[in-house]
A protein has these predicted regions:
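Bacterial N-terminal signal peptides that target proteins for export
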Residues: 1-9
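Hydrophobic helical h-region of N-terminal Sec-dependent signal peptides
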Residues: 9-15
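C-terminal motif of bacterial Sec signal peptides marking the signal peptidase cleavage site
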Residues: 18-21
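Alpha-solenoid helical repeat scaffolds
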Residues: 23-522
Length: 522
């Protein structure tokens, strides 16, 4: 069966044949060459035919033969379609200067400017059209969207509110919610989105936006409820599942997040979803599950090797963990993290000399670049624990040279000075600055207590130690310090309790701690 397009072409060719006359008759002087239509109207018909077929170049060639506003506008339209805006604008300007098809030209020019990102010119043209056609709701909606793009949210709201009741309130309200968000008027945005859902209960984007607004307002339960409502309508709505899982992560509901991410894995083979699940499983201590999830990936990235090493390490499969980490060099983007994990594994294996060598090698690599301060923190701590306190102080001092406000380095130096009862005023200043930056860090709280104790201010020290124990009840040093402070206040029984707890928590209790216990027991 012939198509409509084929029939049109046959008609056009028939007209051409009739116009051309008999083949054996030579053309008259001044007539067009064979194969070229003699009538502008016929040329226009053929040009439109080629345009409808998407034969842009052929259509342009034919339109170019016609010096007429219709052909100018057609060429502008095609140049817009094939993304040649400058050529399109040449014809549009010609139309506007000739005062023909001005409205159509302005509308097309508006779209060209919008595509180019020339929003102000697009707004100017659209405002002219709106003034001419105030009842055209599509133009006014377009203008409102343009104003949102240029952050004229109040102007957009005025236009949109004037459009309510025009027949498409759901989209007007949805766009109005964006203008409200732009003005940081969250209650306004929430109200508009609720009205959208009332009008269009299956309009998914409104649920997603409403959930996000609830989150911005700190209304986590309401956000969860909205996302779940959407999933009741569209159980496989990926964006809603992602939003719900992210909400659970932000509220530390990791198991609930895992459930949602597992649903995502059933809907999508995207490896990033698998990696997200791995991180959640590691967070929740589900190391066997994390191991199984990682190894399901067809292609392993550098990050995957690192996560796999963590899973192995947590399962006490230390040799396998170390083998994975050997694939990650210091020069790679995970060089810092891998070095720290290698050092931790070596320490767990009792290979302390190798652990120290690993940290020293990483420090030598990163410190000239002022990178990976975490290696410096760990190295300083291990040097201090190994009785090489001065070397540890030297590392911390270099960290402070790079960043004088580094809270970890400030705390390290301040604590060492407090422990040695030297430079106490300066130590107090350093620890105070560290605590200002990290007010809930139990180690810094302990350091503040210790410097206050050294300054003979045990009552104040006790306040900080209580906070430190609330934050971290498993650190032996904090409990030993609590015992020292309580003992200085004459509370021997409570002091003994903390000394005993410190001894139980210590892998190798110091002789000094045992002496404190024995003195109180005796």
């Amino acid at each position: 069966m012939r198509t409509a397009g084929s029939i049109s072409l046959l008609i056009a060719l028939s007209i051409l044949a009739l116009s051309a006359g008999c083949a054996h008759v030579p053309p008259q002087e001044g007539s067009r060459v064979a194969g070229k239509p003699d009538s502008p109207r016929l040329t226009l018909m053929l040009a439109r035919y080629e345009e409808n077929l998407g034969n842009w170049n052929d259509a342009l060639d034919l339109y170019a033969e016609i010096d007429d506003p219709i052909a100018w506008f057609a060429q502008a339209r095609i140049f817009y379609i094939i993304n040649k805006p400058d050529l399109a604008l040449e014809f549009i300007d010609r139309l506007i200067e000739s005062d023909v098809y001005v409205d159509e030209a302005l509308e097309l020019r508006t779209r060209i400017y919008a595509r180019k990102g020339d929003w102000n010119q697009a707004i100017e043209d659209t405002e002219i059209l709106v003034e001419r056609y105030p009842e055209n709701t599509q133009l006014r909606m377009f203008l409102a969207n343009l104003k949102i793009i240029v952050s004229d949210f109040t102007g957009a709201q005025e236009i949109l509110r004037s459009l309510l009741g025009s027949g498409n309130d759901s989209m007007v309200l949805y766009t109005l919610s964006k203008a409200c968000l732009g003005n940081k008027d969250l209650p306004c945005a929430k109200d508009q989105l609720r009205r959208v859902i009332e009008l269009q209960p299956r309009f998914g984007p409104a649920y997603l936006e409403l959930g996000r607004v609830h989150e911005l307002l700190g209304e986590k339960r309401e956000a969860e409820s909205v996302y779940k409502q959407y999933l009741e309508i569209e159980p496989d709505a990926v964006e809603a599942i992602v939003a719900l899982s992210d909400l659970y992560i932000s509220t530390n509901r990791y198991q609930d997040a895992i459930d949602q991410v597992q649903k995502l894995r059933q809907l999508s083979s995207d490896p990033q979803i698998t990696r997200k699940l791995v991180l959640l499983q590691l967070q929740e201590g589900m190391f066997e599950e994390a191991l199984s999830t990682i190894t399901s990936l067809q292609e392993m990235s550098l990050e995957d090797s690192y996560y796999l090493a963590i899973a192995y390490a947590k399962l006490d499969r230390l040799d396998e963990a170390f083998s994975q980490l050997s694939q990650i060099n210091l020069t790679s983007r995970l060089g810092c993290e891998a070095a720290l994990l290698r050092a931790s594994i070596l320490k767990d294996l009792g290979r302390n000399d190798e652990m120290m060598d690993e940290l020293l090698k990483a420090w030598d690599f990163f410190s000239p670049k002022n990178g990976c301060a975490e290696v410096g923190y760990q190295l300083a701590t291990e040097l201090d624990a190994a009785g090489r306190r001065e070397e540890g102080l030297d590392i911390a001092t270099k960290l402070l040279q790079s960043n004088p406000k580094d809270p970890i380095a400030l705390n390290f130096v301040g604590y060492i000075w407090a422990d040695e009862a030297i430079n106490l005023d300066q130590a107090h200043e350093m620890i105070s600055e560290a605590l200002r930056q990290r007010p809930d860090d139990p180690y810094i709280l302990d350091s503040m207590a210790w410097v206050l104790f050294r300054q003979n201010r045990p009552e104040e020290a006790l306040t900080y130690l209580k906070r430190a124990v609330e934050k971290l009840d498993s650190d032996p040093t904090i409990h030993e310090h609590m015992g020292d402070v309580l003992l200085s206040l004459g509370k021997k029984d409570k002091a003994l309790d903390h000394y005993l707890k410190a001894s139980l928590l210590s892998k190798n209790a110091r002789d000094e701690l045992e002496e404190k216990i024995n003195e109180l027991v005796d």
